[in-house]
């Protein structure tokens, strides 16, 4: 057969000579190999390959696959790995718009032949001794996006589908030594129209490549269907085994052992259902796995292969419109997870997967959706072992073909009901199903993501239903096309508002409800999670959701000034792009947990454990309040010395001095034990740096007057209300330049007990826009090395604070490394905090403590002002000033999280500009 370039633009050609998909089992030569997890029947081809990159097909070295081809102009590339992360081609991130939008006028299934980069790979190798003399196949675990394959100058085959294995039989072409394997990888093909996921657009061989040998008779596929009877103690095991080769007279034996190593079944694997008594069911709470070992012998009784596989017995079904596992309702406390590494992109390793699983277990995450493609097989093994429920999603997304700039316009949607696309997408469903069907963790098959609906996706759903009665089928896209409601067994939506979900659940629906995506964690987000979790307590048919998403998709690179930074769309001269819209993770791109994670951990815990957490916090807060009251009562009054100048009022006490300035509209100096604490006079605070969610709902535009107010307050007067040795009280009044105008006041009372009471009041006016916050702000004169506080742990906001643990905490002041800097570091419900300055030896040189007056407050201590943060596009752009920006708030806007493109913060967490707001606190002098 002669390969043809036209295959790239023909959706009916997606596999040429590709072997049938099969289970992800490991074939070993001996029992010892099987127990070690290693096999002599495989040979890895990972590592360095010869490589040449071309901008388009016309520029490629078309005959590089010839045995005598001159490769002197080839470089090297790492496999697995992305071409674009190894110095070739153009990096690009885009969400829904196709990468070529505005540059090429295309419609499905067209390809721009002038802009379709090609990677030419060559691997030279000798066959391992353990593979010689047998049938040999090659497995490409992931190639993006279309590949042609040659071996020793002979064309072998062609394949698409970036995220499931493509395997080929090399037996007619391979020799023991001096083999040359050549792969031509195209970045774009007709498959590009249905691989329009919201991610960086890469190409190349990004998952492992290996050879495997098939003995005389070979276990080609297994399906160990491990069902559970209604009594939840009887396992129903149906071992289905497909052989190839010299199958006449061959036999397969099966041994199944329990977690303690005792055999629960020994006998043939003949396809009959085997009843096993005393089974421990598999679930998140108890992910019990049984160890199965298949042994294959040829007609002469000679051992040919041994296949180990861990299986879990469970029963997943719909009961009266509720999804149930082993007879009990299941609630998905889930997260969407892209495969990602900040240095390697989607070419992740085992270390990445183990790290992610540790985060899942620590934070009560019990479910994952493999958005929007099948993951590496190891991830499924880890989910089996750790009881993580899976929605396994087909590699299908055509978002840009039916939704343009937010508007639903499916006139040229693919695959739709187009017959030429049907086989292609059903094949993708089949490839995923065949590979992953043995995994207990996979409860639900998903037909893909954001591809509208039609007969083709209905055919995918029918395939899953026909082949696997033990699982359910998911697809959210029918929300936009109700004519195809039958595709999905459940009502699945993304970013539905809590009140919309309630309306659905109160309508007595036939289908249960899940959120396949919710809580869009872009930047500083995840506020209001309570509104969703409470639905699960109230409605049996609300069965949870999957946070969007697990990890920020950002790439570590060096910026124009030589600084290492996590880059996002646009940082790589990529256009079109969606900039930082890929930064939605509950962990940063380097794997560090975001502050919001403590609320994930709290809300994904059981109701009983949440109640116990709340009770502990309430008791700890009550103790702290009692201790603070005792400490305040124990303070002894002293004598104040007052000095009245022409423009300043000075107050001196035991170890402190304050200078109230009429001209600066506030205290210009606050020295405690000889250390100056004020860089400039404190001011009322009206602004926080906009968050991604703020920007998404247009809040900065609506509240822009408060940015001006935060910077350009008008000094309306300075009044001395009390002046004596027993106390001094002064008041500053400010004009707030909003429309309509408003007023604010700061009142300072120097108390003889050695404290400075600060009271801030904002007087609202009708028609004033909503506030980001209100309180008091100041900058310290010198750097602050450490902040200590009594209150809730971590970063907390009014709509994201339940996960905090009440107690005494500390941190080094910092800006959270969101892809685009934004407000961060707030601590609500604070009783007191201390700013520490350190000397060169790291010892405390000075400290300033601020405590609540009549009620807890919120505070932040950040190395930059709100305006500096607002102006930066990367954390490396923030100036190092040597000062600390301290803000104490009586009112603060929540961060929201329903979505990041239109929905405002929930009503209880907004700050009205029409009402009065105040905060009071004491500075201990």
Identify the residue ranges that each predicted region occupies.
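Extended substrate-binding grooves/exosites of carbohydrate-active enzymes
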Residues: 1-37, 104, 193, 303-627
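Accessory beta-strand-rich segments of carbohydrate-active enzymes
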Residues: 2-19, 27, 31, 35-36, ...
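Beta-strand elements of well-folded, non-transmembrane domains
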Residues: 49, 53, 127-129, 142-144, ...
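Beta-strand/loop-rich accessory regions of lumenal/periplasmic or secreted enzymes
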Residues: 84-86, 92-94, 187, 283, ...
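Short strand-turn-strand beta-turns centered on an Asx-Gly dipeptide
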Residues: 150-156, 257-259, 326, 654, ...
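Extended acidic/polar, glycine-enriched regions
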Residues: 172-178, 242-319
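Low-complexity, Pro/Ser/Thr- and charge-rich linker/hinge segments at domain boundaries
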Residues: 206-223, 313-329, 625-631, 785-789
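Surface beta-strand/loop "capping" patches
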Residues: 216-245, 595-616, 629-647, 760
């Amino acid at each position: 057969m002669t390969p043809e370039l036209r295959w790239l633009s023909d959706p009916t050609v997606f596999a040429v000579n590709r072997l049938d998909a099969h289970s992800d089992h490991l074939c070993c030569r001996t029992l010892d190999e099987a127990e070690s997890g290693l096999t002599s029947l495989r040979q890895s081809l990972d590592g360095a390959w010869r490589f040449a990159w071309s901008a388009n097909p016309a520029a490629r070295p078309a005959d590089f696959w010839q045995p005598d081809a001159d490769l002197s102009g080839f470089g090297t590339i790492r496999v697995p790995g992305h071409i674009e992360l190894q110095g070739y081609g153009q990096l690009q991130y885009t969400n829904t718009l196709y990468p070529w939008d505005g540059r090429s006028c295309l419609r499905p299934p067209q390809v721009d032949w002038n802009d379709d980069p090609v990677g030419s790979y060559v691997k030279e190798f000798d066959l391992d001794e353990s593979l010689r003399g047998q049938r040999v196949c090659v497995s490409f675990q992931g190639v993006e996006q279309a590949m042609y394959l040659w071996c020793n100058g002979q064309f072998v085959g062609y394949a698409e589908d970036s995220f499931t294995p493509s395997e080929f039989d090399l037996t007619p072409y391979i020799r023991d030594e001096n083999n040359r394997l050549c792969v031509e990888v195209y970045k774009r093909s007709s498959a590009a129209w249905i691989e329009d996921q919201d991610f960086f657009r890469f190409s190349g061989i990004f998952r492992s490549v290996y050879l495997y040998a098939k003995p005389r008779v070979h276990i080609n596929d297994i399906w160990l269907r491990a069902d559970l009877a209604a009594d939840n103690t009887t396992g129903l095991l149906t071992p289905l085994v497909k052989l190839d080769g010299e199958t006449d007279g061959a036999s397969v034996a099966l041994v199944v052992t329990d977690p303690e190593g005792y055999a629960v079944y020994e006998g043939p694997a003949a396809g009959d259902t085997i009843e096993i008594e005393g089974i421990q069911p598999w679930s998140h709470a108890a992910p019990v796995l049984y160890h199965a070992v298949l042994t294959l012998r040829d007609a002469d009784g000679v051992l040919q292969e041994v296949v180990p596989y861990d299986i879990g017995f469970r029963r997943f079904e719909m009961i009266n419109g509720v999804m149930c596992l082993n007879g009990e309702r299941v609630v998905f406390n889930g997260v969407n997870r892209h495969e990602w590494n900040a240095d390697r992109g989607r070419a992740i390793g085992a270390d990445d997967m183990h790290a992610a699983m540790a985060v899942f277990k620590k934070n009560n995450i019990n479910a994952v959706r493999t958005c929007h493609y099948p993951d590496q097989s190891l991830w499924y093994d880890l989910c089996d072992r750790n009881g993580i429920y899976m929605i396994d999603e087909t590699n299908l997304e055509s978002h840009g073909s039916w939704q343009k700039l937010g508007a639903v316009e499916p006139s040229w949607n693919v695959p739709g009901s187009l017959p030429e696309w049907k086989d292609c997408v059903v094949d993708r469903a089949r490839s995923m199903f065949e590979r992953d069907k043995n995994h207990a963790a996979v409860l639900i098959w998903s037909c893909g993501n954001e591809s509208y609906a039609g007969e083709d996706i209905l055919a995918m759903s029918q395939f899953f239903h026909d082949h696997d009665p033990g699982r359910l089928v998911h697809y959210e896209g029918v929300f936009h096309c109700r004519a195809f409601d039958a595709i999905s067994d459940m009502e699945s939506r993304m970013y539905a508002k809590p009140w919309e979900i309630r309306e659905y659940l109160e309508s007595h629906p036939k289908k249960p409800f899940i959120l396949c995506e919710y809580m869009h964690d872009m930047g500083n987000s995840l506020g209001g999670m309570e509104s969703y979790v409470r639905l699960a307590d109230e409605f049996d048919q609300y069965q949870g959701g999957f946070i969007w998403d697990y990890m920020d998709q950002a790439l570590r690179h060096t910026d124009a000034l030589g600084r290492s930074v996590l880059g996002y769309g646009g940082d790589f001269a990529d256009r079109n792009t969606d900039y930082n819209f890929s930064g939605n993770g509950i962990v940063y791109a380097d794997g560090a947990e975001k502050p919001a994670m403590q609320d994930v951990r709290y809300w994904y815990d059981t109701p009983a454990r949440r109640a116990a957490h709340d009770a502990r916090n309430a008791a700890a807060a009550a103790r702290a309040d009692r201790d603070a009251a005792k400490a305040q009562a124990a303070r002894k009054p002293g004598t104040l010395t007052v000095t009245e100048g022409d423009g300043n009022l000075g107050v001196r006490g035991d170890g402190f001095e304050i200078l109230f300035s009429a001209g600066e509209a506030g205290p210009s100096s606050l020295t405690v034990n000889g250390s100056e604490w004020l860089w400039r006079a404190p001011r009322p605070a009206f602004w926080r740096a906009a968050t991604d969610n703020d920007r998404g709902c247009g809040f900065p535009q609506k509240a822009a007057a408060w940015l001006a107010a935060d910077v350009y307050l008008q000094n309306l007067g300075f009044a001395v209300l009390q002046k004596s040795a027993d106390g001094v009280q002064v008041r500053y009044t400010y004009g707030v330049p909003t429309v309509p105008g408003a007023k604010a006041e700061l009142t300072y009372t120097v108390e003889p007990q050695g404290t400075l009471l600060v009271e801030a009041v904002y007087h609202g006016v009708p028609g004033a826009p909503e506030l980001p916050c209100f309180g008091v702000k100041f900058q310290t004169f010198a750097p602050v090395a450490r902040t200590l506080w009594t209150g809730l742990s971590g970063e907390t906001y009014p709509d994201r604070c339940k996960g905090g643990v009440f107690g005494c905490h500390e941190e080094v002041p910092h800006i959270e490394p969101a892809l685009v800097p934004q407000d961060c570091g707030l601590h609500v419900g604070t009783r007191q905090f201390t700013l520490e300055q350190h000397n060169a030896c790291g010892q405390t040189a000075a400290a300033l403590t601020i405590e609540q007056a009549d009620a807890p407050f919120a505070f932040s201590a950040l190395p930059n002002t709100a305006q500096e943060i607002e102006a930066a596009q990367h954390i490396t752009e923030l100036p190092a000033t040597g000062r600390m920006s301290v803000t104490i708030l009586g009112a603060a806007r929540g961060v929201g999280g329903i979505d990041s493109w239109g929905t405002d913060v929930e009503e209880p967490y907004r700050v009205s500009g029409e009402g009065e707001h105040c905060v009071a606190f004491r500075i201990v002098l």
